[in-house]
UniProtKB/Swiss-Prot annotation:
It comes from the Bacteria. Disulfide bonds: none annotated. CDD domains: PYR_PYL_RCAR_like. This is Uncharacterized protein Rv2574. InterPro entries: Polyketide_cyclase/dehydratase, START-like_dom_sf. One of its GO terms (cellular component) is plasma membrane. Pfam families: Polyketide_cyc2 (PF10604). The lineage of its organism: Bacteria, Bacillati, Actinomycetota, Actinomycetes, Mycobacteriales.
Amino acid sequence: MYPCERVGLSFTETAPYLFRNTVDLAITPEQLFEVLADPQAWPRWATVITKVTWTSPEPFGAGTTRIVEMRGGIVGDEEFISWEPFTRMAFRFNECSTRAVGAFAEDYRVQAIPGGCRLTWTMAQKLAGPARPALFVFRPLLNLALRRFLRNLRRYTDARFAAAQQS
């Protein structure tokens, strides 16, 4: 594992590469946080993720840690830098299995709306070394993938909570 810059919340506004997308979900903010805390749920909607392992006990909060394994053998050692139940959570990579990641953070902001909630997801990156120019080229494709993940999340939460309501 290679160290990443230990960025704060402001990185999700100032990073060299920012991706911000929004989805409206037909679930409550509480239900969304249930999904975001569920390690089995992440691979179901963010399909680049293969496994999530919480390395801190509940209750989760700022300072909580987890390991996220992704396709291509990439592993991120994450630390939550914000955990405001039902409104916001954000994490950064403290370490990554590739040297290409100089700094990485994600910010999930949740707003209650009529009939559910709105999730605004920001991914912030700073690449290192020769990987830097690659993201400039692949930026549109990455953003398409991120939007697809949010569509997946909507389908996943629709199915998960529709089944719960029928029980």
